[in-house]
A protein has these predicted regions:
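An acidic/histidine-cluster motif and surrounding catalytic segment
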Residues: 1-90, 94-243
C-alpha cells in the first residue's frame, strides 16, 4: 500500500523526523506537498469553501490553515481514485508505534469490506466489529477529531469527493459526519501511529478568532443539536458496520 505523508515543503524539521523514523524501519513513503492556505488555494478549489454557511451555522469561516488542510486531503483523495487502490494518508506530526508494520499488512484485508480505516488513537465510544490478524476492528461512533492517519479506498475517496462540492467544516469534522457522506468510520486497535503533538500546528497554524455575535451562537448550537441527532441515528443504524 502506498503511503503519502502530507507536509509543507518548508517543514524541514518535521520532514527530517518522518524520514528518520520510517527509514529506520525500511518503510517506503512519499511526501505530498501540503497546500499552504495562507498562500491561497489552487484556482480550481478556491470556490469550494462555503464561508457563509460556516458563519451562519458554525460561527466563523474556515481559517486559511483549515482550508489548506482540507485541500491537501482533497487532492490525495483524487490521487487515490486515480491510482484505483487504497492508500495510507499520514500528516507529518505522527510517530509510528511498534505495531505499524502489522497494521500496514492488515489494511488491505480490511479494505476488502470497508472504505475507511483510522490508524491513530480516537476518543469517544466505539463498537467492536471483528478481529483481523489478531487486531480489533472498531466502528467509531464519533470520528470528528484529527486526520493524522487513515487509509482510504478508491470508493471511499469517491464518497468524500462527491460530498466536497462545498466545504462547510474542517476536514476532520467532515470525514466524521458519516450521515453526510455515507462513509463508515472504522479503526484498528492496536494503533499504527500516534501524534506526540510536540511541534505545534504547521499546516493550520493559529489565527485570532473574532468574537461571535449572539445570533450566530444560537444558530451554531441549534446546528450542533441537529448534527448530534443525525449522528445518533446513523450510529443506531450502522453500529454493526454495515452499509
Amino acid at each position: 500500500m502506498k503511503i503519502y505523508v502530507i507536509s509543507l515543503e518548508r517543514a524541514v524539521e518535521r520532514r527530517s523526523r518522518v524520514e528518520s523514523v520510517l527509514a529506520a524501519r525500511g518503510i517506503d513513503f512519499e511526501f505530498f506537498n501540503a497546500v499552504n492556505g495562507f498562500e491561497g488555494l489552487p484556482e480550481r478549489l478556491q470556490a469550494l469553501p462555503d464561508d457563509q454557511h460556516r458563519i451562519r451555522f458554525r460561527s466563523r469561516p474556515l481559517t486559511p490553515g483549515e482550508k489548506g488542510c482540507y485541500a491537501s486531503h482533497f487532492l490525495l483523495w483524487e490521487k487515490c481514485v486515480e491510482l484505483n487502490e487504497p492508500i495510507l494518508i499520514l500528516e507529518d506530526d505522527f510517530l509510528p508505534t511498534q505495531y505499524f508494520e502489522e497494521v500496514l499488512g492488515t489494511l488491505p484485508k480490511v479494505h476488502e469490506q470497508y472504505e475507511y480505516v483510522k490508524v491513530e488513537p480516537q476518543i469517544g465510544s466505539a463498537s467492536a466489529l471483528t478481529t483481523i490478524d489478531n487486531m480489533q476492528l472498531m466502528f467509531w461512533h464519533n470520528n470528528s477529531c484529527w486526520t493524522t492517519g487513515y487509509s482510504i479506498s478508491p470508493q471511499g475517496a469517491r464518497r468524500l469527493l462527491a460530498h466536497s462540492k462545498r466545504w462547510v467544516c474542517s476536514v476532520d469534522n467532515f470525514i466524521g459526519e458519516s450521515y453526510r457522506t455515507g462513509l463508515i468510520c472504522t479503526g484498528l486497535i492496536p494503533y499504527a501511529i500516534y501524534s506526540p503533538r510536540d511541534m505545534g500546528s504547521d499546516i493550520q497554524n493559529q489565527v485570532e478568532l473574532k468574537k461571535v455575535p449572539l445570533g450566530f451562537k444560537l444558530t451554531r448550537e441549534l446546528y450542533r443539536c441537529y448534527r448530534f441527532i443525525r449522528m445518533t441515528l446513523w450510529n443506531m443504524k450502522h453500529c454493526g458496520g454495515k452499509s
